[in-house]
Amino acid sequence: MRALIQRVHNARVEVEGAIVGQTGPGLLILLCAMAGDTEAEAEKLITKITKLRIFKDEAGKMNRSLLDIGGGALVVSQFTLSADTSRGNRPGFSAAAPPQEGEALYLHAVDLLRGHGVATQTGQFGADMDVHLVNDGPVTIWMDTSA
């Protein structure tokens, strides 16, 4: 699985002008299930995300996790994270999991976040979405369970 995580002051996602998910301080997680991914990879990724020490402590050092700060998460499906740009000028997305498998893994990842006690909201799988965010830092981290 692949994720692009961004530390945010706040974020929201809209579908057809209506807000479908939002969070205050915490993480915006753009998530992509890759072909062949399993629930075990989702578990590995989500556990790492919840424990990653990327929030500032009292001294201003990145030393606190999402769990430590009681932050929220907004999870948005993002199959374009599977882009292969090695040939030509048009990205290929064949490395992404098929939609049905991708959605199941996406929903599993969301359930895992909630199971860790993270207040989690989502976008709408497969929809065209407008994502609004206010970066904190900015802190943006690429994660890939196959790397």
Swiss-Prot record:
It is found in: Cytoplasm. Gene3D superfamilies: D-tyrosyl-tRNA(Tyr) deacylase. Coiled coil: none annotated. GO terms for molecular function: D-tyrosyl-tRNA(Tyr) deacylase activity; Gly-tRNA(Ala) deacylase activity; Ser(Gly)-tRNA(Ala) hydrolase activity; tRNA binding. One of its GO terms (biological process) is D-amino acid catabolic process. InterPro entries: Daa-tRNA_deacyls_DTD, DTD-like_sf. A Gly-cisPro motif from one monomer fits into the active site of the other monomer to allow specific chiral rejection of L-amino acids. An aminoacyl-tRNA editing enzyme that deacylates mischarged D-aminoacyl-tRNAs. Also deacylates mischarged glycyl-tRNA(Ala), protecting cells against glycine mischarging by AlaRS. Acts via tRNA-based rather than protein-based catalysis; rejects L-amino acids rather than detecting D-amino acids in the active site. By recycling D-aminoacyl-tRNA to D-amino acids and free tRNA molecules, this enzyme counteracts the toxicity associated with the formation of D-aminoacyl-tRNA entities in vivo and helps enforce protein L-homochirality. HAMAP family: Deacylase_Dtd. This is D-aminoacyl-tRNA deacylase.
